[in-house]
Regions:
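A structural signal for short, well-ordered beta-strand segments and their strand-loop junctions
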Residues: 89, 165, 212-217, 250-253, ...
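Helical catalytic core of nucleic-acid polymerases
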Residues: 333-447, 453-455, 470
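A general structural signal for short secondary-structure junctions and capping/turn motifs
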Residues: 80, 154-156, 204-206, 241-250, ...
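Short beta-strand-to-loop capping motifs
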Residues: 90-94, 217, 468-473
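DNA-dependent DNA polymerase catalytic subunits
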Residues: 3-7, 19-30, 275-355, 406, ...
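DnaQ-like (DEDDh/DEDDy) 3′-5′ exonuclease domain used for proofreading
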Residues: 2-209, 228-235, 265, 270-325, ...
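Metal-dependent phosphoesterase core characteristic of DEDDh/y 3'-5' exonuclease domains
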Residues: 182, 210-282, 413
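A residue-level signal for conserved active-site and pocket-lining positions in enzyme catalytic cores
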Residues: 167, 253, 383, 414, ...
């Protein structure tokens, strides 16, 4: 820790906030150093007495050893309160005594703001943004005398944080540590006997001096355990569900880092308004809840218990006003030519902003701006900026990648904002809000369909916020003009997302003629393959099956006309499937191309069914490898029909052979998935051919 010899004003990046008694310990990156600074901070909560007067409550606890102060405060009792009310604010001397005091005081009334984490309470009260830039005034003892958050900029580059991304495996006292760069490409590998390898990695860690460690939680716990075992300097410790790393370093969840990269992780954590050691692995719902909590605290709203604000709908209301969900226009199953997919740009957050829809104003009028709008607008503006900025950066792959990961990180949040509005876990949410957003979405989608119909376009598929339209002879310009007109009349941005040369809308897997939702594939006029809901899109599909399906789709659709697709195209696709099956049967496919990968969502022992990846994880545990929640489990089928689930598969890297029949079935199923609209015609053709051969031998 560096001590400054005089009072100084410093600018840096906020890495973490930790607590010791009545002090917040801030770790800030200043230049190329991580500096620890102290700020006096007392935990607090609010109470509204219900069986004693406020004066009586103050009298009862005024002399309590661990209460610093009880004072009167004006707060909004809920987000729909028109005026502030007087409540009592209880300040506690130490984080250690906080929970016991909350429990004690709650006997005398309703307590509020108790669900906030200490770090988020501090961030909200100081209006700070984690991983954001700030200015601090400090004295010669590194005690903060003033602090201010700087506004978030629109820089494409991520902040100058050094990240060490690694994974760890240990088997028979042989340690393997691999580090990766931002693109998850291997950089260094430390392999060998446990102690020597660990020592080399610890020395590398000290020399590289990263600001952040990106790894699986189990790997970091194992690293700290090995450091303890061999009496080496510790990287930190795990306490109260988060890592407190040495020298102010920050933990990042590896799965989130792989998916979003540093730029996306920064964007997501800045939205969460919670420090990364706690929030780096949060799903969108948890992130939204955190941001709402932060904003409510900062704006003076009392924070209710989980689900406290949820109004209960009567049976009559439920039957009369039941939600019909988003509008789905059933797919017109089969092959289509010259189709444009028009997509409303962030439709649901746009509706929230346009119609001023928020939890508290759905039933009570919308004269003032709702609670949801401020931070939803900020998030949407940032997402659209980075989304559109990508087009300017297509010649710069690195900056394009940063833009893409930033906008994707925010897209997940915005997509879930409307769904989370009716979730039971949402402190402020209610079904009315969710239903109102859905209603507006349905109205606007129907309006867009009618505009298209009047212009001669036919809707062949519609799903909540997108329309698939075709019109014989229509050009890309025609579709662009249509989207502009829809934008003008609905006041919701809409663009041509894809212009398909050929598009196949798939039926349900039962083989019936009912169209399946979000199951299609097609090729655009610029030869881009777009697909949804098929094996190629699934993360647990092995590389060989996915590659075969992609090749067969391209073979089918790489034709001059619709008639060619229905004849030569289908024939060429079947040839690709047949060739792949022959390669499997002859043992020509590398085993690593048949490896499936699935993420463990919980400990293997917590699964009720012994699914293939669960059986593989348990087998690894039996063999001395510690795998758990969050680990990516690779496996290969070796005897898929065996009664014993442990004999059906083998963990990746442990098998010599594979079940050829199983993989041939998987390839055939992948082929059948894309051929479903054409199978009936093929069967009729085969019947006709067999009859002709019978009568004309």
């Amino acid at each position: 820790m560096r001590n400054w010899s005089e009072k100084m004003r410093l600018e840096g990046w906020l890495l973490d906030v930790r607590f010791r008694e009545d002090q917040a310990m801030l770790w800030i990156k200043v230049g190329d150093q991580r500096v620890q600074m102290k700020d006096r901070f007392n935990m607090d909560f609010f109470v509204s007495p219900d069986n004693v007067t406020q004066e009586k409550l103050v009298y009862l606890f005024d002399e309590h050893d661990h209460i610093v102060k009880i004072d009167k405060s004006l707060r909004f009792l809920s987000i729909d309160s028109p005026e502030k009310s007087q409540v009592l604010r209880v300040s506690v001397d130490s984080i250690t005594h906080y929970r016991n005091l909350v429990k004690l005081v709650s006997r005398y009334g309703e307590v509020f703001d108790t669900s906030l984490s200490p770090s988020q309470r501090y961030l909200a009260d100081r209006s700070l943004i984690p991983l954001g830039k700030l200015v601090v005034d400090v004295n010669d003892q590194n005690i903060i005398t003033g602090i201010e958050s700087l506004p978030l900029g629109l820089e494409v580059e991520p902040p100058p944080f050094k990240v060490l991304c690694f994974d760890l495996s240990l088997e028979n006292e042989m340690l393997d540590l691999v580090t990766y760069n931002e693109y998850m490409q291997e950089e260094y590998r430390f392999t060998g006997p446990e102690y020597e390898t660990l020592l080399a990695f610890v020395e590398y860690l000290s020399e590289y001096d990263p600001d952040m460690l990106a790894c699986m939680e189990t790997d970091l716990k194992r690293l700290i355990s090995l450091q303890t075992k061999h009496d080496l300097p510790l990287s930190g410790y795990f306490h109260r569900k988060s890592f407190h790393l040495d020298e102010g370093r920050v933990y990042l969840n590896l799965m989130s880092y792989r998916r979003m990269s540093l730029a996306g992780m920064v964007e997501r954590i800045q939205y969460n308004r919670e420090v990364p050691r706690i929030a780096s692995d949060w799903a969108a719902g948890r992130a939204i809840e955190s941001r709402q909590t932060y904003e409510a605290r900062r704006k003076g709203y009392l924070l209710p218990r989980n689900g406290f604000y949820q109004p209960v709908m009567s049976l009559e209301e439920l039957l009369r006003e039941r939600d019909h969900g988003g509008l789905i226009f059933a797919p017109n199953v089969g092959l289509h030519e010259n189709v444009a997919a028009l997509d409303f740009e962030s439709m649901f957050p746009q509706i929230i902003l346009k119609h001023n829809i928020s939890y508290e104003n759905v039933r009570n009028g919308r004269e003032t701006e709702g609670f949801l709008l401020d931070f939803t607008r900020d998030t949407l503006d940032r997402r659209l900026y980075f989304k559109h900025k990508r087009k300017e950066l297509e010649g710069d792959p690195e900056k394009w990648f940063w833009c893409e990961t930033r906008q994707q990180a925010l897209k997940e949040i915005l997509f879930c904002t409307y769904g989370y509005s009716g979730c039971w876990a949402n402190k402020f949410g209610n079904m009315d809000t969710f239903m109102e957003i859905n209603k507006a979405a349905r109205i606007n989608l129907v309006k867009a369909m009618n505009i298209a119909r009047r212009k001669g376009f036919q809707t062949i598929y519609g799903n909540s916020d997108s329309l698939f339209l075709e019109r014989k002879g229509a050009t890309r310009t025609d579709f662009d003009v249509l989207s502009d007109e829809i934008y003008t009349k609905t006041e919701l941005p809409i663009t041509v997302e894809n212009h398909f040369r050929f598009l196949v809308l798939l039926p349900q897997k039962s083989g019936k003629n009912f169209g399946a939702i979000n199951r299609y594939y097609g090729v655009t006029y610029d030869n881009k393959l777009v697909c949804r809901g098929i094996e190629l899109r699934r993360r647990n599909t092995c590389q060989f099956v996915a590659k075969t399906q992609e090749e067969s789709i391209r073979a089918m659709l790489d034709q001059e006309s619709r008639d060619d697709v229905l004849s030569k195209g289908i024939e060429d696709a079947n040839k690709v499937i047949d060739r792949a099956c022959r390669e499997i049967k002859r043992g020509l496919v590398p085993i690593d191309a048949l490896e499936s990968k699935t993420i463990l969502r919980r400990k293997p022992s917590k699964y009720k069914a012994r699914l293939p990846h669960v059986a593989a994880a348990e087998a690894l545990n039996i063999n001395g490898l510690d795998v758990g929640k969050g680990n990516v489990i690779g496996y290969v089928y070796v005897d898929a029909d065996h009664k014993n689930p442990f004999r059906r598969i083998s963990p990746a890297g442990y098998q010599k052979n594979f079940d050829a029949k199983k993989y041939m079935r998987l390839v055939e199923e992948a082929g059948r998935s894309i051929m479903l609209p054409f199978l009936k015609k093929e069967e009729e053709a085969r019947k006709t051919a067999s009859l002709e051969s019978f009568f004309n031998p």
